[in-house]
Structures are given as structure tokens and as C-alpha cells.
Amino acid sequence: MLIDAEAAARRERKVAKLVKDARFKDPSACVEDVVYLPDRTLAKDRINRLARCEWIGESEVVVVISKTGCGKSFVVQALGNAACRRLIPVRYTRLADICDDLNRARAAKDGSYFEKMDAYKSVALLLVDDFMTTPISTQNSVDLFEIMEAREGRRATVIASQLEPNEWYLRIEGELMADSILNRIATGARYIDLEGPNMREYFAKKRRAD
């Protein structure tokens, strides 16, 4: 029993470290707390299947699309948390933060750019939120292409966006680069089209009622 307790404690510490390293905006997000409503296009059985993380081992891409406030960020982070529980390294970030991170590292000219690129390319599960909320530069388009090229068929990726893939195209500098990036993300991806009420308003009303 003591050995089992020690093993469980070690595992808990590993999970806690993975959650910390993932840099979730909401570290408490978990699939158990995902809200399923009649007017919300989110299937519990599908989320539970994704939470088993088999698709991560297959290096698949999951794309979550919804308008602002529908809870896509929570769902994405909940899936990331499920991966951490299975001892899978995760990184949560926003596309704008990736661009800023790489731009600063490139300007520093101290070798950190290559280290950061390697980290984005190699983490087992990369969660990219707010994808193409704003247009990205030619240089950042190249960065994104290099990341997705390295991950394709080797690492799993989740993309969360307010926009459909055909709208991403208009926010990437260069037609050829846009084609190359979208082909690696959108083709063959699993899609979750999340529609429903504004979840911020839903929880605000719920708190007032309580």
C-alpha cells in the first residue's frame, strides 16, 4: 500500500509539472467541467473520446471553430489537461504570442530563436488559440510554415479560431505560403464547430442566480 501511495504521489507531481509547463491560461480547465447544453453543438461522447488522447499518438490535428465567448478556449485547454493527466507534454499558447516570442528571439540574435522554434516543433501536443485573429507578417508566415511542416505526421496540434479556414487564407502573407500552411493544418483535420450561447454570459447569469 505504501509503495502504491508513493507511486501515486510521484505521478501527481509529474502531472502537476506538466500542467505548469503547459502554461494554460486556465489550469483548472478539465473535460469533467465542460458544459453540455441543448443549444450547444458539443457532443459529450466526442469530447470524452478526444480526452482519451489516442489521436495524439496518431499525430492528428484538431480544429475548434466558434465565435467569441462560446467556450472554445476552455474546451481546448480541457483537452490539453487530459493529455497532461496521461503524462503527455503540452504547450498552450496564442498565435500572436508565438509570433511575438519568435520576433523577440530573432531580434536578440543569441541563438534563442532556434531553441524556441525547436520547442514549438517538438512538443507532443501544441495548442494554438486565437488562430489568425489578426493577419501575420511574411516572416511569421514562414515561421508558422516551418512549425507545421515539422509537426505534420509527427506531433499532434489543436487549433482554435473564430474564423473558418478559408478566412485564414486572407490573413497569411503570400498565396503560396498560405496554401502550404493551410494544406498542413486543414486537410484531414478533425473539426469541432462549436455553436451555442455565450458562455461568459451563461456563467455570469448562473452566478447571479446562486
Where are these regions (language model features)?
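Post-Walker A helix-loop "phosphate-sensing" segment adjacent to the P-loop in P-loop NTPases
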Residues: 81-93
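Walker A/P-loop nucleotide-binding motif
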Residues: 59-75
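Phosphate-binding P-loop
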Residues: 51-59
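N-terminal pre-Walker A segment at the start of P-loop NTPase domains
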Residues: 29-51
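Interdomain "pre-motor" coupling segment immediately N-terminal to P-loop NTPase/helicase cores
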Residues: 1-26
